[in-house]
Amino acid sequence: FAAAAEVTPTQADDARGTVAEARTWLRELLADAVLVLPSSAGGAPARDASAETIEAERAGTLRMSCLAGLAGAPAVSLPVLRTADGRPAGLCLVGAPGTDLDLLNLAHAIEGSTA
């Protein structure tokens, strides 16, 4: 909240404009495609990971996972990947707004093919 209190009205207006441009671009991209990306910036952190490691993972994941919310688009994560060192990782599918059921059907097909 402290950081938000420092944002000026001009900065907020500029940010809203950037968000609107990004939303339009993402929706155009997703109109006839599904975005496929990792569900997180890396694999699951170790149980004994430091707070700094966990925060870095969270921040990296937030940068990637905000795309669906920014576009108002459905997304689903599938626990079907592993990192090179064997840690669990997910695959995220992002579809166009309004394609929720199609996206779930695709996720189901992918999950079935990796079982």
Please tell me what each predicted stretch does.
Residues 1-70:
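Serine-dependent amide/ester hydrolase catalytic core
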Residues 13, 70-115:
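Structural helix-boundary/capping segments
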